[in-house]
Amino acid sequence: MIRLANEKDIEQINNLLFQVHKVHSDARPDLFKAGSKKYTNEELKEIIKDKEKPIFVYEIDKKIEGYAFCILINHNNENSLCDYKSMYIDDLCVDKNSRGKGIGKKLFDYVLEYAKKLGCYNLTLNVWGGNDIAMQFYKNIGLKIQKIGMEKIL
């Protein structure tokens, strides 16, 4: 079942946040601190309350097997962009023990339908270089490159 997250889910969400962070810190130890996570519990509580930042969880038998952190973005009255609404997936994770079962695709499809209902023009996300599994997953489900961020280490 996919549903909106609530405060009772924070502990299980944290377990998944650590998994995502490990992928990032393994790929880019120069940028990501090992053993940490993206949000504090207080930050998670605030995000859960924010209707513009829905967190959807995939739950089986009271265990959260995956999540999608989303952000609704309204582009209005910007100098160079047309007015449009966009749904941004800030983070999508499936528990490492549950991957390959279609959970990520189900979460993505759920967010896609949610974004359509809100009248969004597009659904976007970012993938860190080195996260080849995620990159391939997103390509396999039909996402196309919108823009590429590049860097030169000094």
For the regions a protein language model found, what residue spans apply to each?
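A short beta-loop-alpha structural element at the N-terminal edge
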Residues: 1-15, 24
